[in-house]
Structure formats: structure tokens, C-alpha cells
């Protein structure tokens, strides 16, 4: 890092390069923040588990959490930014008590991409609800035939479609403007657990299923998927019988430029797909992924500090740890641990603030931030310290000289 500072002073490195390296360095120093404690607000015992977290997409100030006891809590993260004391206990801003709206556990939460006044929640009770944050009242409710594993908004779309993955081999599209369903996407042969919209094309949707396939859809067409990823790269993506994982595909995440799609499955593997060719990049992260979740979708945190920087992934593991990975290099960076054997159910990254929040089976929400470097010693402190060498020297020169 000192070499970058020196190069910047000499004008040898552009500011963007220095900023990129600084952000990546800080990301690699993520650690539990001991100064911020977040109150447990989702009950006790097994029903106190935190199943979902989401941070608003506009100013990154509000966070919503959902528990296994069906409660929903809204948190104001600005209190963290404005804290003056060393220790802060963060409490909820508003809450939906257990069993007052959803009847069973929350499975997924997402903010409306263009407004932090709306968020959505899905549950084991077969419903998808749209919420008004100011009143914390339901605006719409969509009811499915079975439990909902996950759902997703498009980050760029002109439409207001919400893709839902529920205990079915098809994907249901819900239109928030009309309050009704538009159509279903059929092609999987097992339950669909994960869905995620392409960040560059508002009509392209990715899905992952218990049949071991990761598929791409054009929602303007009612036909089957236009691509099915092949982990062996033997067949073209147009082959509908390809296999993507040796197990259930339970998580998906796009890079911000949509050039790559990451999928994770119960085979304890993360695969990185090149979206220009549809081929498996064959990135291997080693035996550090522990992922056997089939109750709801896993949401890996895709982190790219700047458009020209490396892409990192924070992956919540079943063993209570977070794995920090360099996605395109296929390398393991470091393991972040809460010293608990209870699995981390969810993780949410707060852009521009370099903070990460995680929720676990114990009902805890933790905050992670770059570990602070030790402050350099002040000159004033050095001046007040006892200088033994100087004292010895002074004592020697002050000895009177005598002549025999």
C-alpha cells in the first residue's frame, strides 16, 4: 500500500487504480465490528432464526430483516454512521410482529429497486406481500399454491414484474401494477428455488432448480428456456437436458456487467458461467463451501468496488462462517468466522459504506466492517515518553571532571 501512496505522489499511478487497490485492500480486512451490537428482535429458540436480510438500493440507509417466527423488522443504518460513542446498540425502527401478517417464517426480502419506500416479503405461508415502509402496511398480497422459496425484482426494468420461485417446477410472474399474475415459465423438472434478473437486459431471467439445472429465460416468450448451462461444456446451452450441478441449485448472482453468472448448489460448488458463450469457466474454490440448504434460496453477496476492480463474493456457509472469494480468479481469499456452529442464513452488503450484515440460526444479526489499522504514534506521545538513552547520556556529561 505504501508503494501506491508513493506512486500517487509522483503522479505515476492514476487515481482510479489507487482507489481500486485501496477498496480491495479494505474489503479483504473485513471483520466483526465489536463496537456495534444489534438487538435480537426475532424471538428466541429455533423460531428466532434470521432468515432474510435486505438493504435498500437507493441511499443504503434502511435494512429489513425477516425471521422464522414470521416477524419483520426495519432498521435505520444511519444511526451507525452518526454514532459518537465507541459502543452502539442498534434497535429496530419499526416492526411487524409475529403472526400478525405472515403466518409462517419469512423466506426472502427485497427492496423496490427505484424507491426505498417499498419492499416485498415471501413466506412459507404461500404468500408474497408488498409493503409500504412509511406505514408498514400491506399494499398487495399474491397467493401461490405452495410455499415460496424466493423472489426477485429486476434492477433496471420498466415493468413491475416480480419473479417468484415456489414449490413447483414453474416460475410465476406477478405484476405489481395490476395486482395479478401475468404468466408462468415452465421447463424445469424439479422445484425452482432461486431466481435472479439480468442487470443489463430487463427481459432475461435466470433460475435454479432441484433438477440440478441453471436456466435462462426470455420472459416475452412463453416457450421453454433459451439456455441451460452444462457443467462439462460438452453440449451447447440450447440443449435442454444439460446438467449444471450435481444437486439442487439454490442460489444465483450476476456480476454488475452481466458478463458472468454465479450459481451455487447442494453439491457444495460455486460455478461461474460466461454469459457471452454460455460455458462453464471451470473456476474451483476448493473444499470451503458448505451449502445444503433446501428450505429457501441462498443469496451470495456479489461485491465489485468499482467497474474495473476484481469481483468478490461473500458466501454464507452452513458451518457459521463467511467465505470471501475472488470470483473470476477462482481463488479463496479468507474465511470470516462468528465462532458459532450455527449456519449463516443470509448476508447483505452495504455499498459505499463497506459494511456487511449477516443473520444466523441463533437469531443474531452481526455487522462486519474493515478492521481498523493501528493508529500511528503521535509525536507528542513520543516526546512525553521516558528516553533512557538520553538520561544516561545526560548523566555522563554532567559528571564533573577532576584532576589528580
From Swiss-Prot:
- Which ranges belong to the motif DDB-box? 1-19
Alphabetical UniProt keywords: Cytoplasm, DNA damage, DNA repair, Repeat, Ubl conjugation pathway, WD repeat
Q: Where in the cell is it found?
A: Cytoplasm
Q: Where are the WD repeats?
A: 45-85, 101-141, 187-227, 244-283, 339-378
Record-linked InterPro entries: G-protein_beta_WD-40_rep (IPR020472), Rad28/ERCC8/Ckn1/ATCSA-1 (IPR042238), WD40/YVTN_repeat-like_dom_sf (IPR015943), WD40_repeat_CS (IPR019775), WD40_repeat_dom_sf (IPR036322), WD40_rpt (IPR001680)
Q: Which GO terms describe its cellular component?
A: Cul4A-RING E3 ubiquitin ligase complex; cytosol; Ddb1-Ckn1 complex; nucleotide-excision repair complex
Q: Does the keyword Lipoprotein apply?
A: no
Q: Does the keyword DNA repair apply?
A: yes
Q: What does this protein do?
A: Adapter protein for ddb1/cullin 4 ubiquitin ligases involved in transcription-coupled nucleotide excision repair.
The cross-references to PANTHER family, in alphabetical order and at most eight, read:
DNA EXCISION REPAIR PROTEIN ERCC-8 (PTHR46202:SF1)
About its domains, the entry says: The DDB-box is specifically required for ddb1-binding.
Q: How does it assemble?
A: Interacts with ddb1.
> What protein name applies here?
DNA excision repair protein ckn1
Organism this protein belongs to: Schizosaccharomyces pombe (strain 972 / ATCC 24843)
Annotated gene: ckn1
